[in-house]
Amino acid sequence: MELNGLISLNLSRNLLTRRITSEISLLESLNSLDLSKNQLCGGIPSSISRINSLSFLSLSNNNLSGEIPTGSQLNTFNATSYEVNPSLCGFPLPNKCLGEEMTWNSVENRGNEHVGIQE
């Protein structure tokens, strides 16, 4: 079965488990993808950024983890597309991933010695 012309895919609330396949990018005509409110795990495949026609994305309320991929269409979605995935990080979510630029704040000054924490 070929799904090349598929424009909208809504599989929300289906108790789906496992990972999102990288082959999702083969759905090049997809405008809307809703996989919310399932039990999907693992990372979001970077190949999803190759779906240039994507104008709606909801991956919220799953168990996704890792850094949100960046690129073309993915940069246009806000945090609601990814919310309630506690182990997901990166733009546009407020929680940064390990390895992202961190800053030091001085929390205590003992003479010339600074003790800091990372944000």
Segment roles from a protein language model:
Residues M1-E119:
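Membrane-proximal ectodomain caps of single-pass cell-surface receptors
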